[in-house]
Swiss-Prot record:
Pfam families: PTS_EIIB (PF00367), PTS_EIIC (PF02378). Keywords: Cell membrane, Kinase, Membrane, Phosphotransferase system, Sugar transport, Transferase, Transmembrane, Transmembrane helix, Transport. PROSITE patterns: PTS_EIIB_TYPE_1, PTS_EIIB_TYPE_1_CYS, PTS_EIIC_TYPE_1. Induction: By maltose; repressed by glucose. Gene3D superfamilies: Glucose permease domain IIB. It comes from Bacillus subtilis (strain 168). InterPro entries: Glu_permease_IIB (IPR036878), PTrfase_EIIB_Cys (IPR018113), PTS_EIIC (IPR003352), PTS_EIIC_1 (IPR013013), PTS_Glucose_EIICBA (IPR050429), PTS_IIB_1 (IPR001996), PTS_IIBC_a_glc (IPR010975), PTS_maltose/Glc_sub_IIC (IPR004719). The gene is malP. The keyword Membrane applies. The keyword Transmembrane helix applies. This is PTS system maltose-specific EIICB component. The phosphoenolpyruvate-dependent sugar phosphotransferase system (sugar PTS), a major carbohydrate active transport system, catalyzes the phosphorylation of incoming sugar substrates concomitantly with their translocation across the cell membrane. This system is involved in maltose transport. One of its GO terms (cellular component) is plasma membrane.
Length: 527
């Protein structure tokens, strides 16, 4: 059950990967339309402003079509076969569901307490999805419907029908079944969701009122649950869902950047919900402190090697906000250190929130700069000065706390391991190429294919693998016999940052190239 929950959580990350670039475009466009910074150039009737307005509207694509992206994205990770067809089925069924909801509320809206004559948005509980006026179920509805379609797809896509009904096989069969299932679901949603919307409104008020305590708990859970893969369920309702802001913090913040840039009111007063998106500060300020502590406490003869390991993963965490490569270098060595990391991350976010820092800062430096500092520094500069000062203070706190704990408890962090060589059955890439009669001067693609093959071998071979999926940085694999899987040292030798083991379920921490690695692994498995 835990494995299924983890896979479901990782599936939500597929569309999330699209938000980074879109956020940068919106942030830069807002900056170049800001009258305070650009002066006469920011005249709405001028060519400069109009050009950036056009560019900005393109950047809004993923924010304005979030439910559609989640409906299409879920099958990419969860469909076990014919993922492209599963995406088409999910989109078709999701639109069908919304047409049913729209029709039901148009005919019987009074019975369900919904007035379809209202304008969409605001407190109406209504929205437009692909031109359909329907209940605003946000990404929750999209994920729910898409998950049903994926279940039906995995179960019935290959079902053989009589020859005279052959035209209804495959995707058509899934859509047919789903069509009739959507009718009672649409009825149920039309009855239940207005009550849920009322509850969400109360939840938003409660979480905002919880203030610093709520921010601490949220940030702590977002960090501490990373090893389980369940952290997706913590941040997604806040960042992309309606837990504290209509449309999610990402969308709401981007929509109001222009307004905030023109206001002299404190940011915390303008958008108190922004305290629930400060968890990226631990990536920008906390990780450097951890990395420095690892380097300082490493053995003298291993410092150069440790620096080579830490510099790229630290920069990845700071700039892109991807922390798993460095966090997994010490998570399994010392879970206690990871718990300390979660406590410090939560405390940093809370202190910043109490100092008036809010915004969309769940990622790395790119997100902080383009969606916060650049567009808003002109009118809220001191807020970000406080943020940087607090952040650098916590960099020092991280360093001294981690250094003390590593030395006090003699923790075998990178560069402090015992010099023991583990024997492995896995042959090297060179030996593999020789066995395959391949030229040593292989292309990058061929080398990547070799690595994929070696990962398969490390996981017990093709016959031992039953399922392969991925999230942002992890290759998630189910195997028949976990005893055939090689030790972690083998995976690290291949370039992995670590391995999470949970019975027959394995998560190989590869990094941002994991989607390409999954494709290569699947290609080899299907040969």
């Amino acid at each position: 059950m835990m494995q299924k929950i983890q896979r479901f959580g990782s599936a939500m990350f597929v569309p999330v990967l699209l938000f980074a670039f879109a956020g940068i475009i919106v942030g830069i466009s807002t900056l170049f339309k800001n009258k305070t910074l650009m002066g006469p150039l920011a005249d709405p009737d001028g060519f400069w402003y109009q050009c950036w307005y056009i560019i900005e509207q393109g950047g809004w694509t993923v924010f304005n079509q979030m439910p559609l992206l989640f409906a299409i994205g879920i099958p990419v990770a969860l469909a076990k076969k014919a993922q492209a067809r599963a995406c088409l089925e999910a989109l078709t069924v999701y639109l069908t569901f919304n047409y049913f909801v729209s029709a039901i509320l148009t005919v019987w809206g009074g019975a369900f307490g919904v007035d379809m004559n209202q304008e969409v948005g605001g407190t109406s509980g209504l929205t437009m999805i692909a031109g359909i006026k329907t209940l605003d179920t946000n990404i929750i509805g999209a994920i729910f419907i898409s998950s049903i379609v994926v279940f039906l797809h995995n179960r019935y896509f290959d079902k053989k029908l009589p020859d005279f009904l052959g035209i209804f096989q495959g995707s058509t069969y899934i859509v047919m079944i789903s069509f009739f299932i959507m009718i009672p679901i649409a009825l149920a949603v039309s009855y239940i969701w207005p009550m849920v919307q009322s509850g969400i409104g109360s939840l938003q008020s409660f979480l905002v009122a919880s203030g610093a305590v709520g921010v601490w708990i949220y940030t702590f859970l977002e960090r501490i649950l990373i090893p389980t893969g369940l952290h997706h369920f913590i941040y997604t309702p806040f960042i992309y869902g309606p837990a504290v802001a209509e449309g999610g913090i990402v969308t709401y913040w981007a929509q109001h950047l222009g307004e905030y840039s023109q206001s002299a009111k404190p940011l915390k007063e303008l958008f108190p919900q922004g305290g629930f998106a400060l968890h990226g500060n631990s990536k920008i300020f906390g990780i450097p402190g951890i990395a420095l502590a690892f380097y300082v406490t490493a053995k003298k003869e291993k410092k150069k090697l440790v620096a080579g390991l830490l510099i790229p993963v630290t920069l990845t965490a700071i700039v892109a906000g991807i922390t798993e490569p460095i966090e997994f270098t010490f998570l399994f060595i010392s879970p206690f250190l990871f718990a300390v990391h979660a406590v410090l991350a939560a405390t940093m976010s809370t202190v910043m929130y109490m100092a008036g820092v809010v915004g969309n800062m769940g990622g790395g430096l790119i997100e902080a700069v383009t969606l916060n500092w650049i567009p808003l520094f002109g009118s809220h500069g001191m807020t970000y000065v406080y943020q940087i000062l607090i952040g650098l203070s916590f960099t020092a706190i991280y360093f001294f706390v981690f250094r003390f704990l590593i030395l006090k408890f003699n923790i075998a962090t990178p560069g402090r391991e015992k010099d023991e060589q583990q024997e492995t059955k896995l042959y090297s890439k060179k030996e593999y190429r020789e066995r395959k009669n391949k030229d040593e001067t292989a292309s990058a693609a061929e080398t990547a294919d070799d690595t994929a093959f070696l990962y398969i071998e490390a996981l017990g071979g093709k016959d031992n693998i039953t399922e392969v999926t991925n999230c942002a940085t992890r290759l998630r694999v189910s195997v028949k016999d976990e005893t055939k899987v090689e030790p972690d040292s083998v995976f690290r030798a291949l370039g992995a940052h670590g391995v999470v083991r949970n019975g027959k379920a394995f998560q190989v921490i590869i990094g941002l190239s994991v989607p390409q690695m999954r494709e290569r692994v699947e290609k080899i498995l299907n040969q």
